[in-house]
């Protein structure tokens, strides 16, 4: 991993878990919020139906350029649509009902993204949120730091949401 922020990469085991979830779900439409290098998008895309599509949103142009190159090297590149910009602006413009949504972007935006995609989730759809333990920091008696506080608020928000069932898995 020659990226300055390589610690943010999804690991091999996490990639296999995403691939497994996608494969058993057989989604037609997947939304990924936060692409980074594109690894998790490629893992998720492996389970798409033959006519399925994965739409992934990346805010940072430099990372989007890396993703585009990585996607082009994959046999799945025709199924993956990369959108560059702010997810809050892009999500409403995508006219799909999502079978899987993978949230792995700015931690302070998780609740916003969750609320944006939930009404457009298919009946048996899945929302997968990465980093919900935030390096164990949300388990501290006093949660501190902008991102840890945001993830803790997201966890509490989802746990209190009667519209969904929740499962927390620790995968790295």
Where does each model-flagged region fall?
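Rossmann-like AdoMet
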Residues: 1-9
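S-adenosylmethionine/decaboxylated-SAM
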Residues: 11-172
